[in-house]
């Protein structure tokens, strides 16, 4: 009985840790949307901002990957 409660807690914790994946998707959408809005306003500046776009997407995705790894650790290592 006690082992079942511990397993349940691990799965609930892993599920809560994956909330960050939704945040990563929202973050990537904001970064790409703002880049597109700026590129449409000033097309000549878009190539210069491409590096900033990739850095912003990388930071947003890193948080999602981090929360996914925490969920995996909670499920299989704890």
Curated annotation (Swiss-Prot):
<dbReference type="GO" id="GO:0008289">
    <property type="term" value="F:lipid binding"/>
</dbReference>
<keyword id="KW-0406">Ion transport</keyword>
<keyword id="KW-0066">ATP synthesis</keyword>
<dbReference type="InterPro" id="IPR035921">
    <property type="entry name" value="F/V-ATP_Csub_sf"/>
</dbReference>
<keyword id="KW-0446">Lipid-binding</keyword>
<comment type="similarity">
    <text>Belongs to the ATPase C chain family.</text>
</comment>
<feature type="transmembrane region" description="Helical">
    <location>
        <begin position="53"/>
        <end position="73"/>
    </location>
</feature>
<dbReference type="InterPro" id="IPR038662">
    <property type="entry name" value="ATP_synth_F0_csu_sf"/>
</dbReference>
<dbReference type="GO" id="GO:0033177">
    <property type="term" value="C:proton-transporting two-sector ATPase complex, proton-transporting domain"/>
</dbReference>
<comment type="subunit">
    <text>F-type ATPases have 2 components, F(1) - the catalytic core - and F(0) - the membrane proton channel. F(1) has five subunits: alpha(3), beta(3), gamma(1), delta(1), epsilon(1). F(0) has four main subunits: a(1), b(1), b'(1) and c(10-14). The alpha and beta chains form an alternating ring which encloses part of the gamma chain. F(1) is attached to F(0) by a central stalk formed by the gamma and epsilon chains, while a peripheral stalk is formed by the delta, b and b' chains.</text>
</comment>
<keyword id="KW-0375">Hydrogen ion transport</keyword>
<keyword id="KW-0997">Cell inner membrane</keyword>
<dbReference type="GO" id="GO:0046933">
    <property type="term" value="F:proton-transporting ATP synthase activity, rotational mechanism"/>
</dbReference>
<dbReference type="GO" id="GO:0005886">
    <property type="term" value="C:plasma membrane"/>
</dbReference>
<comment type="function">
    <text>Key component of the F(0) channel; it plays a direct role in translocation across the membrane. A homomeric c-ring of between 10-14 subunits forms the central stalk rotor element with the F(1) delta and epsilon subunits.</text>
</comment>
<keyword id="KW-1133">Transmembrane helix</keyword>
<dbReference type="Pfam" id="PF00137">
    <property type="entry name" value="ATP-synt_C"/>
</dbReference>
<keyword id="KW-0813">Transport</keyword>
<dbReference type="GO" id="GO:0045259">
    <property type="term" value="C:proton-transporting ATP synthase complex"/>
</dbReference>
<feature type="transmembrane region" description="Helical">
    <location>
        <begin position="11"/>
        <end position="31"/>
    </location>
</feature>
<feature type="site" description="Reversibly protonated during proton transport">
    <location>
        <position position="61"/>
    </location>
</feature>
<keyword id="KW-0812">Transmembrane</keyword>
<dbReference type="InterPro" id="IPR002379">
    <property type="entry name" value="ATPase_proteolipid_c-like_dom"/>
</dbReference>
<keyword id="KW-0472">Membrane</keyword>
<dbReference type="InterPro" id="IPR000454">
    <property type="entry name" value="ATP_synth_F0_csu"/>
</dbReference>
<comment type="function">
    <text>F(1)F(0) ATP synthase produces ATP from ADP in the presence of a proton or sodium gradient. F-type ATPases consist of two structural domains, F(1) containing the extramembraneous catalytic core and F(0) containing the membrane proton channel, linked together by a central stalk and a peripheral stalk. During catalysis, ATP synthesis in the catalytic domain of F(1) is coupled via a rotary mechanism of the central stalk subunits to proton translocation.</text>
</comment>
<keyword id="KW-0138">CF(0)</keyword>
<protein>
    <recommendedName>
        <fullName>ATP synthase subunit c</fullName>
    </recommendedName>
</protein>
<keyword id="KW-1003">Cell membrane</keyword>
